[in-house]
UniProtKB/Swiss-Prot annotation:
One Gene Ontology molecular-function label: TBP-class protein binding
Domain characteristics, as noted in the entry: Binding to MYC is dependent on a Myc domain essential for oncogenic activity.
Name this protein carries in UniProt: RuvB-like 1
Class in the EC hierarchy, top level: hydrolase
Gene assigned in the entry: RUVBL1
Organism: Homo sapiens
Length: 456
């Protein structure tokens, strides 16, 4: 007897360095639990982020900036991702790194503006009137051609639609008759017609005719329930950048130039301020009419000290514009020279006039106990068994070196344990691996000792 194991077809996600972060881990009153949702410690920073999430949800935070400042390996990126998780998928979250703005094709400010627009969502509500049912009759009515001659033109189309509740006869425009012909609609088909645009969609043949033929390449659909005339509310989520791109490069065009343009490699073009202004006007009109609502999202700029003085000056204006998202900066620098200047030093590599506009959240170094908890969570995420002794030793290594280094030792130590035929990582495996791989501090120490042997 042969038994086959059926493998799951669901996508296996690669474990990234922040896969374990599921949220900020706050209770109902907004206080941080010691360890929850994959985050450990940093209670003050997490509570501050919780307040920001509440402000974003109540739409009172637009155009403000927050700076996550702290030493490397204290969880700044993890906090930003936790904010994104808390906000959910409906609020746009656009992550970028400070060095992304340097491009040979377009200006630095253009890259910043593009990401600003990516972080602002627009929720468009549309009520569509739809006629839906099975076609019972389809009669085009002809009249004499007004241009003279013997030809005849179609003046209107009479169509009968039937649902489970009743039937309706509609008198339609001749332009819809062309759509009906394109869709090859005939009696017995289930169709729907949009009242606003006159678009016709054939859904399939009604399943009462399913027994008519043995061989047929038709898709049979049930008779629609409810009335023939229905109202459907459709909600679409788009970002302002999507609207910019759609209008910057219009599709179509039958002439040879536009055909060539589509075939050639599209060069990244800049979207002009004029076009953005026009789109803003249309968006504002929609908001005034109540068709759409603006959803200010989050723009996360990691390694913000990589931006130069021109970008920072541009950020002043962008943050104070009428349509601006919430901007979260992250930096692990202390006092350093602002990029693009000769000798101006500033905290976190950000000019003082911009620092004045941001709210700063500090992240502190982890205690050995918190390091152990984080390593334990990482081991669970990666599906690794680890003994208590090995965990304590990794915690000590993390305190002496960095958290990242001790987390990186997990996978090689697990491999070594498997080679030795053990199920879980023991202390000796961790010791052996830490001797094989150097951390940054010990590597720098060796460099200092043997400086004369290396090339200058």
């Amino acid at each position: 007897m042969k038994i086959e194991e059926v493998k799951s077809t669901t996508k296996t996600q690669r474990i990234a360095s922040h896969s374990h972060v599921k949220g900020l881990g706050l209770d109902e009153s907004g206080l941080a639990k010691q360890a929850a949702s994959g985050l450990v410690g940093q209670e003050n920073a997490r509570e501050a982020c919780g307040v920001i999430v509440e402000l974003i949800k109540s739409k009172k935070m637009a155009g403000r900036a927050v700076l996550l400042a702290g030493p490397p390996g204290t969880g700044k990126t993890a906090l930003a991702l936790a904010i994104a998780q808390e906000l959910g998928s409906k609020v746009p979250f656009c992550p970028m790194v400070g060095s992304e703005v340097y491009s040979t094709e377009i200006k630095k400010t253009e890259v910043l503006m593009e990401n600003f627009r990516r972080a602002i969502g627009l929720r468009i509500k549309e009520t569509k009137e739809v006629y839906e049912g099975e076609v019972t009759e389809l009669t085009p009515c002809e009249t004499e051609n007004p241009m003279g001659g013997y030809g005849k033109t179609i003046s209107h189309v009479i169509i009968g639609l039937k649902t489970a509740k009743g039937t309706k006869q509609l008198k339609l425009d001749p332009s819809i008759f062309e759509s009906l012909q394109k869709e090859r609609v005939e009696a017995g088909d289930v169709i729907y017609i949009e009242a606003n645009s006159g678009a016709v969609k054939r859904q399939g043949r009604c399943d009462t005719y399913a027994t008519e033929f043995d061989l047929e390449a038709e898709e049979y659909v049930p008779l629609p329930k409810g009335d023939v005339h229905k109202k459907k509310e459709i909600i679409q989520d788009v970002t302002l950048h999507d609207l910019d791109v759609a209008n910057a490069r219009p599709q179509g065009g039958q002439d040879i130039l536009s055909m060539m343009g589509q075939l050639m490699k599209p060069k990244k073009t800049e979207i002009t301020d004029k076009l953005r202004g026009e789109i803003n006007k249309v968006v504002n009109k929609y908001i005034d009419q109540g068709i759409a609502e603006l959803v200010p999202g989050v723009l996360f700029v990691d390694e913000v000290h990589m931006l130069d003085i021109e970008c920072f000056t541009y950020l002043h204006r962008a943050l104070e514009s009428s349509i601006a998202p919430i901007v979260i900066f992250a930096s692990n620098r202390g006092n350093c020279v602002i990029r693009g200047t000769e000798d101006i030093t500033s905290p976190h590599g950000i000019p003082l006039d911009l620092l004045d506009r941001v709210m700063i959240i500090r992240t502190m170094l982890y205690t050995p106990q918190e390091m152990k908890q984080i390593i334990k969570i990482r081991a669970q995420t990666e599906g690794i068994n680890i003994s208590e002794e090995a965990l304590n030793h990794l915690g000590e290594i993390g305190t002496k070196t960095t958290l990242r280094y001790s987390v990186q030792l997990l996978t090689p130590a697990n491999l070594l344990a498997k080679i030795n035929g053990k199920d879980s990582i023991e202390k000796e495996h961790v010791e052996e691996i830490s001797e094989l791989f150097y951390d940054a501090k010990s590597s720098a120490k060796i460099l200092a000792d043997q400086q004369d042997k290396y090339m200058k």
